[in-house]
């Protein structure tokens, strides 16, 4: 086992604080509408330019192991806030730095760290209640666009695209962000259920100009296994031909004799038919086939359920108004499934989302939910250079999370004002002793820091602005750093999602409290490089 280096009390906290400062100082320059860029070197390709706090935080690794511990703890604040709320990472970092700085001073002055932590917790609890009480639910499209614009560092085009996407696919719908190959940013909305499997054979194509299959009012056969022989399917195919409707086959695979026969029949014009592979793998494939069955009002043909292919009747097949299949995707529009069945299925998926601990599973479940409940919107972000596209894509991702958070818990005045106004609530917090009161005061000073930093980044005097704001009693009256004016921020469209502000404060206080109550640090001692032996001189 490697030898360890151990640091105690003030020495330990000072080292950690240095790391916290290095990371937070690099992140906080990005805060606000006039936040600056940070350029990050990449081991290959052009450097990356970003205004996204968590991206900067994730890139910072310090040489000194004890300083690095402090930096990594604050990086954890940014990552956690990004995971929960999707935005507010810079605010969380700035708050954490302020709480740790003030807390370390108090501990050095001889106060009890555990009482300080208790005071911090009481203050945060009171502020969270105040934020929830003042949060305003958002209903209009304009408000959603405003949230998106603010989170995208004032880019109104991004805000407009997000509002349009959310209007079209609903709050449950999936909105994905991709890099475009052109200069323009565009929005594409896929109505109905889409999955990433194209036609098995190009011979099924009905629209040769666009190279895609279009089936109007088709029957849909959902089969769990491979189809290689057609003998067992003949009774069903005859029934479909007599009905005069097209048929879509969704199966694990269609191969050999089955595929050849279907293609020949399609080319001769006797049978309007197309086949696609089932989406997903393993258990997820079963679940997705079940989703398709519920959406189209059909039954999954599975050996597990004791249903054999030769016994399948038309009533077991799904129906849809239209199916469009291209080389890569299949879209089922307006499935004939019963509304109550679809709602029951979406409720079941929501429960699974709440219970799962895996981020990957959660993402896949949310995709399935969106396909059943709403639709899918794709925002393709354009730009003149690759660096610009990447930077814009970062901002669109941030803005997307922020708008979702705003719909969930409502909005507050932006510009750090909601936290600043919460200083009044702290006057009523009851504490058991002087050290706990000092903990409350640490938060009182820390929640002024975001406003100061936003103003400072805009080139004005932070202390002066904070003083002016505290003189005036109106909750949403604040300083608009983008224009340099004092005004009602909600009316001016400078708004923050309540969830983002709340999460930033809670995460910052949680990690900062841990740093304040730290008394020892343990790290591996750096290994001394062994010098190579000199070559023998026997010549």
UniProtKB/Swiss-Prot annotation:
EC number, as in UniProt: 5.6.1.7
Subcellular location: Cytoplasm
HAMAP family hit by this protein: CH60 (MF_00600)
Role noted for this protein: Together with its co-chaperonin GroES, plays an essential role in assisting protein folding. The GroEL-GroES system forms a nano-cage that allows encapsulation of the non-native substrate proteins and provides a physical environment optimized to promote and accelerate protein folding.
MF terms in GO: ATP binding; ATP-dependent protein folding chaperone; isomerase activity; unfolded protein binding
Annotated catalysed reactions: ATP + H2O + a folded polypeptide = ADP + phosphate + an unfolded polypeptide
SUPFAM superfamilies reported in the protein's UniProt record: GroEL apical domain-like, GroEL equatorial domain-like, GroEL-intermediate domain like
Species in which this protein is naturally found: Bradyrhizobium sp. (strain ORS 278)
Keyword vocabulary terms for this entry: ATP-binding, Chaperone, Cytoplasm, Isomerase, Nucleotide-binding
Residues reported to bind ATP: 30-33, 51, 87-91, 415, 480-482, 496
Subunit-level organization: Forms a cylinder of 14 subunits composed of two heptameric rings stacked back-to-back. Interacts with the co-chaperonin GroES.
Pfam families, A to Z: Cpn60_TCP1 (PF00118)
Family: Belongs to the chaperonin (HSP60) family.
Protein name, UniProt field: Chaperonin GroEL 1
Biological processes, Gene Ontology terms: protein refolding
An example Gene Ontology CC term for this record: cytoplasm
Chief location bin: cytoplasm
């Amino acid at each position: 086992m490697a030898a360890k280096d151990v640091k105690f009390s003030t020495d330990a906290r000072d080292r950690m604080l240095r790391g916290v400062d290095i990371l937070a100082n690099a992140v906080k320059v990005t805060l606000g509408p006039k936040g600056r860029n940070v350029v990050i070197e990449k081991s290959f390709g052009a450097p990356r330019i970003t205004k996204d706090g968590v991206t900067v935080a994730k890139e910072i690794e310090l040489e000194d192991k004890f300083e690095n511990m402090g930096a990594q703890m604050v990086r954890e604040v940014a990552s956690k806030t990004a995971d929960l709320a999707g935005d507010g990472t810079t605010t969380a970092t700035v708050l954490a730095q302020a709480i740790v700085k003030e807390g370390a001073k108090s501990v050095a002055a001889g106060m009890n760290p555990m009482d300080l932590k208790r005071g911090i917790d009481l203050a945060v609890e009171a502020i969270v209640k105040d934020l929830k009480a003042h949060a305003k639910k958002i209903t209009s499209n304009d408000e959603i666009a405003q949230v998106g614009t603010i989170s995208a560092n004032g880019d109104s085009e991004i805000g407009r695209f997000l509002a349009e996407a959310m209007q079209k696919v609903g709050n449950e719908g999936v909105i994905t962000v991709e890099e475009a190959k052109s200069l323009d940013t565009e929005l594409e909305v896929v109505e109905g259920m889409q999955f990433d499997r194209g036609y098995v054979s190009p011979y099924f194509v009905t629209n040769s100009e666009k190279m895609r299959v279009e089936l109007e009012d088709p029957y849909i056969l959902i089969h769990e296994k491979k189809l290689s022989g057609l003998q067992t399917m003949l009774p069903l195919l005859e029934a479909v031909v007599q009905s005069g409707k097209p048929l879509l086959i969704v199966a694990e695979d269609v191969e050999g004799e089955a595929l050849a026969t279907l293609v020949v029949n399609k080319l001769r014009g006797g049978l309007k038919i197309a086949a696609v592979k089932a989406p997903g793998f393993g258990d997820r494939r079963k679940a997705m086939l079940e989703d398709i069955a519920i959406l189209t009002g059909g039954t999954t043909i599975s050996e597990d359920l004791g249903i054999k292919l030769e016994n399948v009747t038309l009533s077991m097949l799904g129906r849809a108004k239209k199916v469009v299949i291209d080389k890569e995707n299949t879209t089922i529009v307006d499935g004939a499934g019963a509304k109550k069945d679809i709602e029951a299925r979406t409720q079941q998926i929501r429960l699974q989302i709440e219970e799962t601990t895996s981020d990957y599973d959660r993402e896949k479940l949310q995709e399935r939910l969106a396909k059943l409940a709403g639709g899918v919107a794709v925002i393709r972000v354009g730009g003149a250079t690759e660096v610009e596209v990447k930077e814009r894509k970062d901002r669109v991702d941030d803005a997307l999370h922020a708008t979702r958070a705003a719909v969930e818990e409502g909005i507050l005045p932006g510009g750090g004002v909601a936290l600043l106004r919460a200083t009044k609530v702290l006057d009523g917090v009851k504490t058991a002793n002087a050290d706990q009161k000092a903990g409350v005061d640490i938060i009182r000073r820390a929640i002024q820091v975001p406003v100061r930093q936003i103003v400072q980044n805009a080139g004005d005097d932070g202390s002066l602005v904070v003083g002016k704001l505290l003189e005036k009693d109106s909750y949403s009256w604040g300083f608009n750093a983008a224009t340099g004016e004092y005004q009602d921020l909600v009316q001016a469209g400078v708004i923050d999602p309540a969830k983002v502000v709340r999460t930033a404060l809670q995460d910052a206080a949680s990690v900062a409290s841990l740093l304040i109550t730290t008394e020892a640090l343990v790290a591996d001692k750096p290994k001394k490089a062994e010098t190579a032996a000199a070559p023998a001189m026997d010549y």
